[in-house]
Amino acid sequence: MDKNTTSELAASIRSIPDYPKPGIIFRDITTLLGNPRAFRRAVDELVQPYAGTKIDKIAGMEARGFILGGAVAHQLSSGFVPIRKKGKLPHETVRIAYSLEYGVDEMEMHRDAVQPGEKVILVDDLIATGGTAVGATKLLRQIGAEVVGACFVIDLPDLGGRKKLEELGVVVHTLVEFSGH
């Protein structure tokens, strides 16, 4: 991706200081999603590394990963799998606990959403500490999926999430980096 595209995408993301608490800069992609050109460009860039590759499923993490993941799945002619917070899915699920910056939570997916050996890409808006993405990777692998990659619009490299995923052997693709929290 060229620098001009990176700059355009970064400019389409709203930064909100001191949200959700003092010292944090929240990176809000709703402005990117509301801009047809930026949204299309972001999806095209998320898809690009996998063009021509057979990907069975895209796993989107709640909630913005649903928006981006659905668009990526459509472009790759893949199925879409929502990974949700505990208690939100109506059928038989598999669940995993994962670490958050300040505690532990659980996520789940339908047990029959991915078959053993299927190639899956994780999609979300942002990778920070990596807790959610690492948890989703472990959940997918628990049911036999092959996690072939993960893509995010935003990387906050100072928080180390990308490195944690790469240590699990997941190839990570991001579009924009912001320093800090």
From Swiss-Prot:
GO cellular component labels: cytoplasm
Subcellular location field: Cytoplasm
Keywords attached to this entry: Cytoplasm, Glycosyltransferase, Purine salvage, Transferase
GO molecular function: adenine binding; adenine phosphoribosyltransferase activity; AMP binding
GO biological process: adenine salvage; AMP salvage; purine ribonucleoside salvage
Gene3D superfamilies attached to this UniProt entry: 3.40.50.2020
Record has Transferase as a keyword: yes
CDD domains: PRTases_typeI (cd06223)
Reactions it catalyzes: AMP + diphosphate = 5-phospho-alpha-D-ribose 1-diphosphate + adenine
Function of the molecule: Catalyzes a salvage reaction resulting in the formation of AMP, that is energically less costly than de novo synthesis.
Name assigned to this protein: Adenine phosphoribosyltransferase
Gene, per the UniProt record: apt
